C-alpha cells in the first residue's frame, strides 16, 4: 500500500489528573449525571477567567519527553474559533504556532522490522463537551449536550503522514497507549480517553479526514473502507473530494459531513486571558521522574528473570501485567510464572473482557504464585490449575478451598501406578493393540486411568508410566 498515505491526530485526555485544564472542576465525571461537573469557566460564561492547571502542563511535558519530542522554551495558548454546540465559548483554547513540543517519534514493530513513526507536534488544548444522538449522527433529529467533559485537559499528538496501511496505524495507536499508561497520566479504560482523527490520501489525491473515531479497531476499519472507496473513485476516473467524513460504526462505512476546513478558517489568535508558559522550570521538575518505559522494561525482564523475548514482549504490553509477573516471579520460578501468565491467565482475562488492574483485585499475585507452587510440587495437574483459575475469576474464594471442593489435589504417584496396572489388566485387547504398534491404544489406556482418577492424573505422566510398564 505504498500509494496510501496516512497521518493521525490523536486526542488524549489526561484523565488521571484531579481537575480540568483551566478551572477547578473535578475530572471524575464519568459516572456523574450530565452537566453537574461544570462552572462559569468551563461553561464559557462572560467574565469567567481561565487559570492554567500546572499539573496538566507537567503531565504534558512528561508525555512529550517520553515521545522523544523537543520541548519548546515557552508555549502559548491560542483561541481556535469555530461554532459548534459542544463549544460554549464559541472558541476552543488550543495551541497553534507555539505548541508545547515539536518532533519526536514512536517506534513500532511492523512485520518483524522496527519502524519509527515520526511526530509533527504535541500540543495542549481543552476538551469540548459531549454530544449525544438518538440513533446516529446522520439520522438524529436533535442533539443532547453534556458539558461535564468541557475543559478537560487534552493532549493532541500529531504524526507526520508516514503510515501506509490501517494495520500500521493501529500498531502505532497500541504503542502510544502503552506509553501513556506507563506514564500514569491516562486511563485508557475510561470512555473518550483517546479519540482519533485520521487523515488519508491516495496517490496525491484529495486528503480526507475521518473525525472523532473512538476505538483503535474503528480506526483500522474506517481507514480500510476509505482506501477501498477512494481507490474505487480513482479507478473510475473521478477525483477524491477534500472533505471531513464520519465513521458509522454500525455499518462500517464513512459518510460525508462537510467540506474540509483550512487552518485560516479557524482564525487563530493568542488567548489574551492566559500568559505564555515558560517550560524550563517544569522540565527540570519532570526530569528524573519518568518511569521505566516499555522497551527498557522488556530488556530488564529478560536480563533479570531469564525469560525469553517471546514472553517479555507480551508482558510489557500492559504495565499492570508486567508488575503482576514480577510479584509472582518473586515466589516461584520466573519462567513458569511467565508461561502461565502469558499463555493462560491473560487469555482467561481477555475472555471475560477484564484488565490486569482488575486481576490484581480478584486474584492477587501471591495467590497465583501459591497455585503455581502446588503445580511445581506436582500437587495439582495442569488441567486442575486451569480449573482453579477459572473458578477463582468467576466465583472467588480461597485457593485451597477451591481445590478441596473440586477434588483437584493430584493423586500420589503410588496410586497412579496402581490405577495404571488395573487399566492394563482390565484391557488386554488394548494392550495387545499397543504392543502391535497401534499408538492410539495407549490413549485409550490413559483415558481409563483418567476415569479412575476423575481427571486428577497428569495425562503425559500417565502415558509415560504405562509405556514403561509395557516395555
Curated annotation (Swiss-Prot):
Record keywords: ATP-binding, Ligase, Nucleotide-binding, Protein biosynthesis
Reactions it catalyzes: L-glutamyl-tRNA(Gln) + L-glutamine + ATP + H2O = L-glutaminyl-tRNA(Gln) + L-glutamate + ADP + phosphate + H(+); L-aspartyl-tRNA(Asn) + L-glutamine + ATP + H2O = L-asparaginyl-tRNA(Asn) + L-glutamate + ADP + phosphate + 2 H(+)
Top EC class, one word: ligase
E.C. no: 6.3.5.-
Coiled-coil zones: none
One Gene Ontology biological process: glutaminyl-tRNAGln biosynthesis via transamidation
GO molecular function: asparaginyl-tRNA synthase (glutamine-hydrolyzing) activity; ATP binding; glutaminyl-tRNA synthase (glutamine-hydrolyzing) activity
InterPro entries: Asn/Gln-tRNA_amidoTrfase_suB/E, Asn/Gln-tRNA_Trfase_suB/E_cat, Asn/Gln_amidotransferase, Asn/Gln_tRNA_amidoTrase-B-like, GatB, GatB_C_1, GatB_Yqey_C_2, Gln-tRNA_amidoTrfase_suB_CS
Family (UniProt): Belongs to the GatB/GatE family. GatB subfamily.
Protein role: Allows the formation of correctly charged Asn-tRNA(Asn) or Gln-tRNA(Gln) through the transamidation of misacylated Asp-tRNA(Asn) or Glu-tRNA(Gln) in organisms which lack either or both of asparaginyl-tRNA or glutaminyl-tRNA synthetases. The reaction takes place in the presence of glutamine and ATP through an activated phospho-Asp-tRNA(Asn) or phospho-Glu-tRNA(Gln).
UniProt subunit comment: Heterotrimer of A, B and C subunits.
Protein name: Aspartyl/glutamyl-tRNA(Asn/Gln) amidotransferase subunit B
Gene name as annotated: gatB
Amino acid at each position: 500500500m505504498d500509494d496510501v498515505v496516512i497521518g493521525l491526530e490523536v486526542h488524549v485526555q489526561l484523565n488521571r489528573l484531579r481537575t480540568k485544564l483551566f478551572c477547578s472542576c473535578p475530572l471524575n465525571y464519568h459516572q456523574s449525571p450530565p452537566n453537574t461537573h461544570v462552572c462559569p469557566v468551563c461553561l464559557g460564561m462572560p467574565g469567567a477567567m481561565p487559570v492554567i492547571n500546572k499539573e496538566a502542563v507537567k503531565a504534558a511535558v512528561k508525555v512529550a519527553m517520553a515521545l522523544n519530542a523537543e520541548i519548546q522554551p515557552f508555549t502559548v495558548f491560542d483561541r481556535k474559533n469555530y461554532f459548534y454546540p459542544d463549544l460554549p465559548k464559541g472558541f476552543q483554547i488550543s495551541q497553534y504556532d507555539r505548541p508545547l513540543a515539536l518532533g519526536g517519534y514512536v517506534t513500532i514493530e511492523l512485520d518483524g522490522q522496527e519502524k519509527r513513526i515520526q511526530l509533527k507536534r504535541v500540543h495542549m488544548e481543552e476538551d469540548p463537551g459531549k454530544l449525544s444522538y438518538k440513533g446516529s449522527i446522520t439520522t438524529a433529529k436533535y442533539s443532547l449536550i453534556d458539558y461535564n467533559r468541557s475543559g478537560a485537559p487534552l493532549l493532541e499528538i500529531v504524526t507526520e503522514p508516514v503510515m501506509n496501511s490501517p494495520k500500521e496505524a493501529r500498531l502505532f495507536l497500541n504503542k502510544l497507549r502503552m506509553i501513556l499508561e506507563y506514564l500514569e497520566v491516562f486511563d485508557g479504560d475510561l470512555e473518550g480517553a483517546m479519540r482519533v482523527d485520521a487523515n488519508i490520501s491516495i496517490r496525491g489525491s484529495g486528503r480526507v479526514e475521518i473525525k472523532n473515531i473512538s476505538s483503535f479497531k474503528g480506526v483500522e476499519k474506517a481507514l480500510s473502507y476509505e482506501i477501498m472507496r477512494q481507490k474505487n473513485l480513482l479507478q473510475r476516473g473521478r477525483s477524491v473530494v477534500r472533505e471531513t467524513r464520519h465513521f458509522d460504526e454500525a455499518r462500517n462505512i464513512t459518510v460525508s459531513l462537510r467540506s474540509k476546513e483550512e487552518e485560516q478558517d479557524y482564525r487563530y489568535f493568542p488567548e489574551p486571558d492566559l500568559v505564555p508558559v515558560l517550560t524550563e522550570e517544569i522540565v527540570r521538575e519532570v526530569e528524573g521522574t519518568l518511569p521505566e518505559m516499555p522497551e527498557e522494561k522488556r530488556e530488564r525482564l529478560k536480563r533479570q528473570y531469564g525469560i525469553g523475548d517471546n514472553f517479555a514482549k507480551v508482558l510489557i504490553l500492559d504495565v499492570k501485567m508486567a508488575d503482576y509477573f514480577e510479584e509472582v516471579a518473586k515466589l516461584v520460578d520466573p519462567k513458569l510464572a511467565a508461561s502461565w501468565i502469558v499463555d493462560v491467565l491473560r487469555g482467561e482475562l481477555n475472555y471475560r473482557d477484564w484488565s490486569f488492574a482488575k486481576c490484581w483485585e480478584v486474584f492477587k499475585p501471591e495467590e497465583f504464585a501459591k497455585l503455581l507452587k502446588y503445580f511445581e510440587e506436582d500437587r495439582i495437574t495442569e488441567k486442575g490449575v486451569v480449573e482453579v483459575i477459572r473458578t477463582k475469576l468467576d466465583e472467588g474464594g480461597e485457593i485451597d478451598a477451591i481445590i478441596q471442593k473440586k477434588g483437584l489435589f493430584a493423586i500420589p504417584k503410588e496410586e497412579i501406578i496402581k490405577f495404571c496396572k488395573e487399566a492394563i489388566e482390565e484391557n488386554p485387547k488394548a494392550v495387545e493393540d499397543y504392543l502391535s504398534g497401534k499408538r492410539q491404544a495407549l490413549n485409550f489406556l490413559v483415558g481409563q486411568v483418567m476415569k479412575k482418577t476423575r481427571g486428577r492424573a497428569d495425562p503425559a505422566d500417565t502415558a509415560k508410566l504405562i509405556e514403561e510398564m509395557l516395555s
